[in-house]
From Swiss-Prot:
Region (Disordered), start-end ranges: 19-45
Chief location category: cytoplasm
Name of this chain's protein: Thymosin beta-15A homolog
Lineage: Eukaryota, Metazoa, Chordata, Craniata, Vertebrata
Keyword annotations of the record: Actin-binding, Cytoplasm, Cytoskeleton
Length: 45
């Protein structure tokens, strides 16, 4: 094995073969209101 990678495959790669995908946000961060509500619930218990 040599230290340099073989770039011939990369040079031949055709971007047109890639499919466009729609990204979906899965794990959204809670809003400030939600965080405050949870903090109050913990304090009151």
């Amino acid at each position: 094995m040599c230290d340099k990678p073989d770039l011939s495959e990369v040079e031949k790669f055709d971007k047109k073969k890639l499919k466009k995908t729609n990204t979906e946000e899965k794990n959204t961060l809670p809003s400030k209101e939600t965080i405050e509500q949870e903090k109050e619930c913990v304090k009151s218990s």
